[in-house]
């Protein structure tokens, strides 16, 4: 049995995606990486902002996710920071996601990258873009919740 198999450690979180999109569904996918990439991920040198997923020839690919070059490896053994990376999903999941992405206005975005045991996993979300007024509604809702919480906290003190 693999040690630490159930332990999950979040390495990178894409909070901007949750701000810019309505997340309809989420999927977990493995990522095909090189040795220097997994070492950089373990060091926490990942940026998911601006990343996206595309289905090409029945395979899911992760684009524009920046994994910094590993410091200790030489210049010949290092990787390209923003290269496309293949995602590991079941064939059924890929075909289902592809059907949903073909609908107008939907896209796939990486939400978080984490380590489960020794494996790197990425949580991708089927997302629909938010309009400016949707973002303003969310901000107003958060502000209202914050003022209510403040009032309740103040009331509990007295």
From Swiss-Prot:
InterPro entries: SmpB (IPR023620), SsrA-bd_prot (IPR000037), SsrA-bd_prot_CS (IPR020081). The keyword RNA-binding applies. Its main location: cytoplasm. It is found in: Cytoplasm. GO terms for cellular component: cytosol. The keyword RNA-binding applies. Belongs to the SmpB family. Required for rescue of stalled ribosomes mediated by trans-translation. Binds to transfer-messenger RNA (tmRNA), required for stable association of tmRNA with ribosomes. tmRNA and SmpB together mimic tRNA shape, replacing the anticodon stem-loop with SmpB. tmRNA is encoded by the ssrA gene; the 2 termini fold to resemble tRNA(Ala) and it encodes a 'tag peptide', a short internal open reading frame. During trans-translation Ala-aminoacylated tmRNA acts like a tRNA, entering the A-site of stalled ribosomes, displacing the stalled mRNA. This is SsrA-binding protein. It comes from Roseiflexus castenholzii (strain DSM 13941 / HLO8).
């Amino acid at each position: 049995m693999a040690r630490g198999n159930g332990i999950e450690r979040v390495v990178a979180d894409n909070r901007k995606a949750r701000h810019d999109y309505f997340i309809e569904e989420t999927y977990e996918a493995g990522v095909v990486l090189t040795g220097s990439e997994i070492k950089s991920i373990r060091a926490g040198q990942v940026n998911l902002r601006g990343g996206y997923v595309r289905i090409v020839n029945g395979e899911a690919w992760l684009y524009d996710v920046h994994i910094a070059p590993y410091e200790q490896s030489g210049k010949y053994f290092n990787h390209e920071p923003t290269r496309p990376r293949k995602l590991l999903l079941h064939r059924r999941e890929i075909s289902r996601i592809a059907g949903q992405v073909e609908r107008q206005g939907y896209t796939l975005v990486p939400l978080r990258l984490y380590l489960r045991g020794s494996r790197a996993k990425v949580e991708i979300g089927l997302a629909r873009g938010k309009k400016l007024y949707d973002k303003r509604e969310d901000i107003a809702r958060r502000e209202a919740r914050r003022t209510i919480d403040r009032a309740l906290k103040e009331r509990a003190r007295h």
